[in-house]
Each structure stands twice: as structure tokens, then as C-alpha cells.
Design a protein with these regions (language model features):
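Surface-exposed loop-to-helix/strand elements on domain peripheries
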Residues: 225-243, 263-372
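Structured, contiguous alpha/beta core segments that scaffold functional sites
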Residues: 2-285, 289-291, 295-302
């Protein structure tokens, strides 16, 4: 049972009638087990090995991913959104202080326009989707836009129409939100479900998992002051009792780890000490983390140098960093500005403000520093 509510009901918690969603979906809502919902992950579209990622989530908590998303979000916010109209000469004219442009500077009482724009970019790249809920007054005028958590929103459709409404899960209940009351921003299309966008991060979850594992390994070694695991065995045929073995183990740990690292260890009896684990030098953990950084930055379209990732810093100079920022702006940000501007035009401007296609919302990036 899906509860049908007005937007004011969703925001302010009023109760209304319920309505059951009916109809056949144009595309199935629950395709073969999602890569994000699975306990294991394989290489994208392959069957090459399984990795347990039950605690990894969608990858956004990874530090390399966060560095790239921060750069994307902050850089995207540098451009300003204008509402334009095409005049009789076919030229675009900016409409000063258009209500939509003013709204997007402060979409709701709690968030600035920059914060909401960063949400859009992060949501599109992490989950493939970002959603803005429209709040309207009694006269039907748009007065606020609220971002929704992408993982809590499910687009629904019928056999005849791709998307008819959205289900928003909050507080253990599912709310029905009409399609016209949400602006849905997609990054491409999910090849298994055209109602949703496509997340580039899902193709590198394996690498993200590897990066997290390498970090955990480095932390474990460092917490032991860089001393790898060892096996202690007696040289003579008479071994220690279980109690003696436990005491030897505790004594070894106390003498060679933590603040006691480097102190001499004196043991009774002849003993062999064999190293079982690799040292940080043997593992070359820095190299293990380089490949994930390279692939994460590649699928997100962010040069590693600009994100401050180690994979790019060793080749960084002031000159090539400046060239890469221009490359990043022209090949990543400008297409994003055009994509988001078109969605704002179609889903907000023409639905809630203007009824003529002569109007459009577009980002002005003429003052973006990287293009000067």
C-alpha cells in the first residue's frame, strides 16, 4: 500500500487518503539483483571472482571518491544559472531576477543554492540519480525545492508510461509522490532500468573495496608499530604447555610492539621466530592504492592531480595542473552544466513558470576562472 499525499503533507506531516499503485511497469522496478544490494560484487558484467562488500555501501565513503566528489561539487557551483528568453531576432536575452533564478539561489530556508547544486552532482555520480521535491503554496506556485535521499526514492511506471509517480520511503512508510511534483536528474540511463540514471561508481566498487582493504591492512600494521605477525616455535622436541605458549606470546607482543618496540627480547629455551606476514615495505601499500585512485578518478571524470590524489601528484606541476583544470572544465563541467540546465528547463521552468519553449534555463560559465 502506497500512501498518496500532497507535497505539503510530505513536508509538514499531514494525513490524507491512501492509494494503491497499479499497472504494469514499462521496465521492471527490481532488475536482477542490484550491484549495490548484493552481498558480493563481481567485475562489472563479468563473473570474475566475488568480493564481500556488505559493509562497503555505494562507495561514497571512500576517501578517494570523496576527494573527487568535492572537486566536482565545488567546481560545478562556480557557474551561475540564468533564465533566458529568445527574442524576435533569435537572440537570447537574460531575464533579470526571474523567480526561478531567485529560487535557485536559495531553494529552501535551510540550504543555499550552492549546497543543493553540490547535492545534485554528488547524487548523480554516486547513485546515478538526484531528486528535488517541489513545495507549492495554496495558489499552486512553486516556493521551495528540497533534495531527497536518492536511495529512498523509487521511480514507478506503467506499461504505457515510463514514469507515473515516485515512491518515497521515510520513517518506515512509503509515500506516493506525483511525477509532476519531483524534478528527477539522471546521469545517463541505467541499462537495466530506464527509470533510473547510471552510476559510474558501480563499475569500480571492486577497486574501492581493494582500496579500503589496503587502508585497513596499513592501519593494522601501523597499530602494531610496523611489526608483522610471526610464528614462534621451540627448537627442541619438547614444546611448551598451552599456558607457557600463551605467556610467550604475550611477552613477545609486549616487548616488540607499541611503545616498547625495539627493546631486547630474552626468551628461555631455544626458539625459532618466523615471519608470517609481509612488512609495509614488502607489500608496497602505496602502489596497491594507486590503481584504485586512477580508476575512481577516471570513471568520475576528475583528473587525479586536481583531486589531490597520490596517483596524480607525483607528476604534478603548476603548468600541467592549470592545463588539466581547463581540460576538466571543458570536458566534464560544461557538459554537466548543459545537462542540468536542460533538466531544470524541462522539469521546473516550463512546468511551473513558463508555457513557452522560447524560455530556457542555462548556466553562465563565462566568468569561470579556468576558462579565462
Amino acid at each position: 500500500m502506497v500512501e498518496k499525499r500532497k507535497i505539503s503533507d510530505v513536508i509538514f506531516g499531514k494525513q490524507t487518503e491512501t492509494k494503491r499503485s497499479t499497472g504494469y511497469n514499462f521496465f521492471r522496478d527490481d532488475p536482477a539483483e542490484s550491484v549495490f544490494g548484493s552481498q558480493f560484487i563481481q567485475g562489472y558484467n563479468t563473473s570474475a571472482g566475488n568480493w564481500n562488500v556488505s559493509g562497503l555501501g555505494n562507495g561514497e565513503s571512500n576517501s578517494a571518491v570523496t576527494a573527487c566528489l568535492q572537486l566536482l561539487g565545488l567546481s560545478f557551483s562556480e557557474a551561475t544559472l540564468d533564465v533566458c528568453a529568445i527574442n524576435s531576432d533569435g537572440q537570447k536575452e537574460i531575464i533579470p531576477n526571474h523567480p526561478l533564478a531567485l529560487l535557485l539561489r536559495r531553494p529552501n530556508p535551510f540550504m543555499s543554492g550552492d549546497v543543493v547544486q553540490q547535492y545534485l552532482i554528488n547524487g548523480m555520480h554516486v547513485s546515478g540519480n538526484a531528486y528535488l521535491l517541489k513545495q507549492k503554496n495554496e495558489a499552486g506556485q512553486l516556493v521551495a525545492l528540497y533534495p531527497l535521499m536518492p536511495e529512498d526514492v523509487t521511480p514507478k511506471g506503467t506499461k504505457e508510461e515510463l514514469i507515473t509517480h515516485y515512491e518515497y520511503e521515510t520513517g518506515g512508510e512509503k509515500l506516493y509522490i506525483d511525477q509532476k511534483d519531483i524534478a528527477h536528474f539522471k546521469l545517463g540511463l541505467d541499462p537495466k532500468n530506464y527509470k533510473k540514471g547510471y552510476s559510474p561508481l558501480k563499475t569500480v566498487l571492486r577497486e574501492i573495496f581493494g582500496d579500503e582493504s589496503a587502508g585497513q591492512m596499513a592501519t593494522a600494521l601501523l597499530s602494531n608499530m610496523g611489526v608483522p605477525s610471526v610464528m614462534i616455535t621451540p627448537k627442541d622436541e619438547f614444546g611448551p604447555t598451552p599456558e607457557e605458549a600463551e605467556q610467550i606470546s604475550k611477552s613477545y607482543q609486549q616487548k616488540v610492539s607499541g611503545k616498547n618496540k625495539g627493546k631486547p627480547l630474552v626468551m628461555s629455551g631455544a626458539m625459532n621466530i618466523e615471519k608470517l606476514a609481509f612488512s609495509p615495505k614488502d607489500l608496497d601499500i602505496g602502489l596497491l592504492r594507486q590503481v584504485p585512485e586512477e580508476r575512481i578518478s577516471a570513471v568520475l571524470g576528475v583528473p587525479a592531480i586536481l583531486a589531490g590524489l597520490g596517483a596524480g601528484l607525483k607528476h604534478a606541476t603548476y603548468s600541467n595542473a592549470r592545463e588539466l583544470r581547463e581540460f576538466f572544465t571543458e570536458n566534464k563541467l560544461i557538459p554537466l552544466w548543459r545537462m542540468v540546465g536542460e533538466e531544470i528547463t524541462q522539469q521546473i521552468l516550463l512546468k511551473d513558470y513558463e508555457d513557452s519553449t522560447l524560455y530556457q534555463a542555462e548556466y553562465d560559465f563565462s566568468d569561470v576562472r579556468a576558462l579565462q
